[in-house]
């Protein structure tokens, strides 16, 4: 949505002003690694669930359940691989491996929940959850990075909090 893009656009100056160059590089590395690892570790289950929920309306519950199990397994796989982030090629991301895992889990769940909603034809809830998720991310980034001054930890918490709230809304609705 336009609101989501606007808030995301407004967060970039906040990040560049309050995070050091190294910290900003680590945040960028985390986004890059997650965008590469998520489809591999989860075997793109979010896309598969979308397809099979649409194709097989009689077995939607089991498809969604199996997909959630795969997402859980992907989170476990990423947790087991966290020591790899200590390699110098990841530019210090290993120092924030717990935060990285939280970010991975929240991103995986939000992506999965969005595709399940799309597959179940709950299209109206998708922009609502995306907007609320982005709003929570923006507010928490401001509170944690600017007001509390906790830097990169605040970044990781804020970019995890938004999707977790969005996922919770998908689950409730």
Q: Can you name each region flagged by the protein language model?
A:
Residues 98, 127-173:
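Hydrophobic alpha-helical transmembrane segments
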Residues 1-46, 138:
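Signature of the first transmembrane helix
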Residues 36, 40, 72, 76, ...:
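Alpha-helical transmembrane segments of multi-pass membrane proteins
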């Amino acid at each position: 949505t336009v609101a989501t893009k606007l808030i995301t656009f407004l967060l970039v100056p906040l990040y560049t002003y309050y995070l050091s160059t190294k910290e900003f590089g680590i945040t960028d590395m985390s986004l890059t690694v997650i965008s590469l690892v998520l489809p591999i570790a989860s075997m793109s289950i979010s896309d598969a669930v979308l397809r099979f929920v649409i194709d097989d309306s009689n077995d939607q519950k089991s498809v969604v359940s199996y997909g959630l199990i795969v997402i859980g397994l992907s989170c476990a796989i990423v947790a087991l691989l966290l020591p790899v982030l200590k390699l110098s090629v990841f530019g210090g991301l290993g120092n924030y491996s717990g935060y990285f895992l939280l970010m991975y889990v929240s991103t995986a769940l939000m992506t999965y929940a969005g595709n399940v909603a799309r597959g179940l034809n709950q299209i109206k809830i998708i922009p609502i959850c995306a907007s609320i998720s982005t709003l929570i991310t923006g507010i928490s980034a401001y509170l944690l990075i600017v007001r509390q001054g906790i830097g990169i930890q605040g970044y990781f918490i804020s970019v995890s909090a938004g999707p977790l709230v969005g996922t919770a809304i998908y689950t409730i609705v």
